């Protein structure tokens, strides 16, 4: 409903709640949506600051926990996850999302619990991507994909695993699941769903890495039809495009695609894609020979601190700038440890020598096109 109507309903509920714990918890949860933007919705100008939003969400969690109802607590933890996201606290958001899945692990699937179970897995996967825990993102995404209650909505079921697999370089798995995604979406009437546009863009990236420009264009069209507007895709769109462009040695176009300063991307980029965007921006600056590459590396390092994957991307870029082959190979090991087959293979290819041969073979085994050099391109 419109904000004014929602506020009126919330105020009426507050008057009726009295001392009932469940009613008080429900009203506190409503505060998170009516006055704040804790649920990552469409409010352009929420009435609360980031700190106030977090305080509202923490109060909602406290009141929900008192009820002993795991579904009420799950909904409040969702609000707290969103509050952490807007605060730029990606690791706290991921920890809260994981806690939510743990809370729901013993809850039976029912009409009452279905939404919370699905949304908890979605948020756990999304926030895991944000902090570079791709194995975690794959685990939550696989659970989502295999949920019986999503058997007939494959576009939702596969959406998070598609993103995790694409980033890790699991091209074969991503392409297989993309068929289920597309079939289910078409069967649904090609409904607009902006949150699913990221998955379509991720599939487009995989096709781009495979050198299939036609398939990439088709999936980018699907992403646009799903709702990947300029604002919505400000983080993932340039990031995915840059991955493809750099793979094919087009560093200058990649740098141009990443021209926006990270702190100017807007809210839709801030909660999952900020680390990835900043890291790719730094690498593109190095490979394109940008005069401020050291400055962009330093800025990116501050943003990605603690993220094992995007931190390794920044390390790789710094190694390339300093022509430090030993450090470059160390980043390859970091990618391997994180389960990131494509970044690992790409790094070996960039290292040259015998490792380049190993990297090229690994890229071929993943079904991806050969890399171009692209330094200064």
Which residue ranges define each predicted feature?
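Flexible inter-repeat linkers and adjacent short helices
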Residues: 1-79, 86-107, 117, 200, ...
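Residues within HEAT/ARM-like alpha-solenoid scaffolds
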Residues: 23, 112-119, 194
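Hydrophobic, helix-rich cores of sensory/ligand-binding and other regulatory modules
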Residues: 73, 110-113, 154
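Inter-helical turn/loop segments and adjacent helix faces that build the functional surface
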Residues: 107-111, 188
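Conserved short loop/turn motifs at secondary-structure junctions
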Residues: 81-83, 126
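Helix-coil-helix junctions within alpha-helical repeat/solenoid scaffolds
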Residues: 9-24, 100-101, 125-152, 156-377
């Amino acid at each position: 409903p419109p904000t004014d109507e929602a506020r009126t309903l919330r105020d009426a509920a507050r008057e009726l709640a009295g001392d009932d714990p469940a009613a008080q918890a429900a009203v506190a949860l409503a505060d998170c949506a009516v006055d704040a933007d804790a649920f990552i919705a469409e409010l352009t100008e929420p009435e609360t600051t980031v700190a106030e939003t977090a305080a509202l969400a923490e109060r909602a969690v406290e009141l929900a926990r008192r009820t002993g109802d795991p579904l009420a607590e799950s909904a409040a933890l969702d609000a707290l996850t969103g509050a952490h996201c807007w605060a730029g606290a990606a690791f706290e958001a991921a920890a809260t999302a994981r806690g939510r899945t743990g809370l729901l692990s013993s809850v039976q699937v029912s009409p009452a619990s279905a939404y919370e179970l699905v949304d908890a897995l979605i948020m756990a996967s999304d926030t895991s991507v944000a902090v570079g825990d791709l194995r975690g993102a794959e685990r939550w995404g696989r659970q989502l994909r295999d949920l019986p209650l999503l058997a007939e909505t494959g576009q939702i079921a596969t959406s998070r695993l598609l993103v995790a697999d694409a980033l890790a370089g699991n091209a074969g798995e991503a392409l297989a699941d993309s068929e289920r995604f597309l079939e289910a979406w078409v069967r649904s009437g090609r409904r607009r769903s902006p949150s699913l546009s990221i998955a379509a863009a991720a599939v487009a990236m995989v096709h781009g890495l495979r050198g299939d420009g036609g398939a990439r264009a088709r999936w980018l069209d699907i992403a646009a039809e799903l709702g990947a507007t300029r604002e919505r895709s400000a983080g993932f769109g340039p990031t995915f495009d840059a991955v493809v462009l750099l793979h094919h040695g087009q560093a200058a176009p990649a740098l141009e695609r990443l021209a926006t300063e990270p702190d100017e991307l807007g809210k839709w980029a801030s909660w999952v894609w900020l680390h990835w965007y900043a890291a790719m921006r730094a690498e593109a600056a190095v490979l394109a020979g940008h005069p401020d590459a050291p400055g962009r590396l330093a800025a990116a390092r501050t943003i990605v601190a603690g993220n094992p994957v995007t931190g390794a991307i920044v390390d790789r870029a710094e190694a390339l700038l300093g022509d430090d082959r030993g450090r470059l190979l160390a980043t390859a090991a970091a990618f391997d440890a994180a389960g990131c087959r494509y970044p690992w293979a790409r790094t070996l290819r960039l290292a040259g020598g015998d490792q380049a041969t190993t990297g090229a073979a690994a890229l071929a085994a993943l079904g991806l096109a050969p890399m171009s050099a692209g330094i200064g391109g």
